[in-house]
A protein has these predicted regions:
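Membrane-proximal helix-turn-helix segments that form the acceptor-binding/catalytic region
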Residues: 110-129
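Carbohydrate-associated surface elements
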Residues: 135, 157
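Conserved donor-binding/catalytic core segment of Leloir-type glycosyltransferases
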Residues: 166-184, 190-195, 204
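Short alpha-helical donor nucleotide-sugar binding micro-motif in glycosyltransferases
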Residues: 237-238, 245-250
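Aromatic "clamp/platform" in nucleotide-sugar-dependent glycosyltransferases that forms part
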Residues: 258
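Short hydrophobic beta-strand element within catalytic cores of glycosyltransferases
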Residues: 275-278
């Protein structure tokens, strides 16, 4: 018997950010390896702040779906409580939560409260909730009223790659991956690197610069003000299939995020044998082990600068962490898709 499900996503599934990569890879594995027939539903752009017309179209598209399991990405699900309430009796709704919407950095108190209330109302209507980390699952139970009995954790998968030893001298190549938005902490990273002008380093930032024009403009202006334009490159959005060479050429991955629901970029760096500097925010401590990286408090410029100085100056310490990274075995996408499929099967 052919197993069927719908997977509703906000906008273009090809967007190269972590949540969309997760959706895309799970859909691909369900379809190709596990023989599910997946109907991908585009809910439109602009989430979590869709225009009225987009919201109406999204609700209509969801209502028109057959009554098999319907997975709705949390970026949209959390702001469609009216659709969730209408469809809860007729459809097996599955909310896929990458991280609670209210925890995005840079929100006003009013916006955060509105998103929290909306997402809480929507999640009450889900037949089941899938969180992408145990950290997110705990938040959903504690703050959003999600009962543990209707909650599963399915972390992202990670592609397994060959990661050769590193002990390179000369200019240290730093890599940061993630959209240029307040939550990623690029302002903290640039401030820390500004203190290390005497050391040999170059930074490449790979991430969409269009999601927050204000943040991107501010970051470029600060880089110029500090005289770092010849040492920091912003590549913009990079397709997933083009990321591996960036990881392979990097000596050190650094991303001082203020929150991560999982932290796929950290896992990708570790899978490529790249030592990591991250923060203690959200799920990052569960993704980055002490053998593979070092963590500092979010927004702590002094601590970040100290760890950067220590690792930029010491190839041996970088290689020790790189060896730890090479020993880490994350689950594959096929393994995680099988877990995802078991959740859907349990709703039959």
């Amino acid at each position: 018997m052919v197993r069927k499900a719908a997977f509703a996503v906000p906008g273009d599934l090809a967007i190269p950010t972590g949540g969309y990569v997760y959706d895309r890879r799970i859909i691909a594995e369900l379809s190709a390896a596990l023989a599910w027939r997946i109907e991908v539903v585009d809910l439109g752009d602009g989430f979590p702040y869709p225009a009225a017309g987009t919201r109406a179209t999204a609700c209509a598209r969801l209502a028109a779906l057959p009554r098999h399991p319907v997975v709705i990405d949390g970026l949209a699900f959390g702001v469609l409580p009216e659709a969730a309430a209408t469809l809860r009796a007729s459809h097996r709704l599955v909310a896929l939560v990458h991280h609670p919407l209210a925890l995005e950095s840079g929100l006003s108190a009013a916006d955060a409260a509105s998103l929290r209330a909306s997402e809480r109302s929507a999640l009450v209507c889900a037949r089941h909730v899938i969180a992408t980390s145990a950290t997110v699952a705990r938040l959903l139970v504690a703050d959003y009223g999600v009962a543990s009995g209707r909650l599963s954790v399915v972390e992202p998968g990670t592609d397994r790659v060959s990661a050769p030893p590193r002990n390179r001298e000369g200019v240290v190549k730093l890599l940061a991956v993630g959209s240029v938005i307040p939550r990623k902490g690029y302002d903290v990273l640039v401030a820390a690197l500004a203190r290390l002008g005497h050391l040999p380093w170059r930074l490449v930032i790979a991430g969409d610069c269009g999601r927050s024009q204000q943040t991107s403009r501010g970051l470029r202006a600060e880089i110029a003000r500090l005289g770092l334009t010849d040492r920091i490159s912003l590549l913009g959005a990079v397709a997933s299939e083009q990321m591996s060479p960036l990881y392979t050429s990097a000596d050190l991955f650094v991303l001082p995020s203020r929150f991560e629901g999982y932290g796929m970029a950290y896992a990708e760096a570790i899978a490529h044998g790249v030592p990591v500097i991250g923060t203690t925010a959200g799920a990052i401590p569960q993704t980055v082990s002490a053998d593979a990286g070092v963590l500092v408090a979010p927004d702590d410029v002094e601590a970040l600068a100290a760890e950067l100085q220590r690792l930029i100056a010491s190839p041996d310490q970088r290689e020790r962490l790189a060896a730890g990274a090479r020993a880490v075995k994350f689950p594959s996408w096929s393994e995680q898709a099988a877990r995802f499929a078991r959740v859907l099967e349990s709703l039959a």
